Amino acid sequence: LLADKQELEFLQAVAGRLPEDIDVMRALGDLYTRTGAYAEGLRVDERLSRLCAEDPLVWYNLSCSLALSDRADDALEALGRAVELGYDDYEWMKKDPDLSALHGDARFESILEWIYRTFEQTPDYDEL
């Protein structure tokens, strides 16, 4: 799509001028993945995981990029790290198409089960 190509050119230019800008890197990584440029998206996500080592969303996105690159073991390791850091969106993780290569893997199912037991079953005290 022309709009994606223009956005990509714009973000690449901005990233060239602001190579350490986390928000620009996030947007660029997302756009690479959305447009099927998985290797480029993976490079951005790997860099973000070094710069933002305690950010669960960074690790979740890295897991997605790894899964899209047919690196299931590494994807599951990154996903585990995301969960350790607090990523808990069970519903999205179940249906995220970027993680579809992990579906059916016992380790993925175990991570989902742990999130469900830990976060989804916790009473919402605001509603009590």
Regions found by a protein language model. Give the residues of each.
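Terminal, low-structured helical/coil segments at or just beyond the last alpha-helical repeat
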Residues: 2, 93-128
